Amino acid sequence: MKPEYRRLNHVTINVPAGEHEKVRAFYGGVLGLEEIPFPESLASTYDLIWFKCLDFLIHVDFTPPFFRPAENRHPALEVKNIGEVRRHFESLGAEIREALVIPDRDRFYVLDPFGNYFEIIEMHADQVR
């Protein structure tokens, strides 16, 4: 039987151990995501903070070992008003990187304090997603 996918549930981002305040400042402050409670049943085994993003979660994992992020492995978040979003990130001191042009969208990257890339995209209205 072919799987019937309902939605993306979560992505996991790896960061160095002990950087909880930097994570909260970036993911909660810069990206504007809501932190949600981490299940107590997992707390003795894992060190994570969970953030809600639309209808999926971002699990930020402090559990060693930390792997150096790679630019080509990243989540992409679609936004409205990409220019305003970019100015907001810049006003908060977030690191911005340019992205190569793709004709049907505007995009750039924002990096968390540990080098994890997030692609920020605004699709042109007449394009299929």
Identify the meaning behind each predicted range.
Residues 41-44, 66-67, 100-103:
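A short beta-turn/loop motif at secondary-structure boundaries
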Residues 68-89:
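Mid-chain, well-packed structural core segment of small domains
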Residues 1-24, 73-75, 127-129:
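N-terminal beta-strand motif that seeds the catalytic metal site of vicinal oxygen chelate
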Residues 1-7, 90-129:
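Vicinal oxygen chelate
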Residues 47-49, 73, 104-108:
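Short beta-strand micro-motifs in enzyme catalytic cores
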Residues 13-57:
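Core segments of cupin and vicinal oxygen chelate
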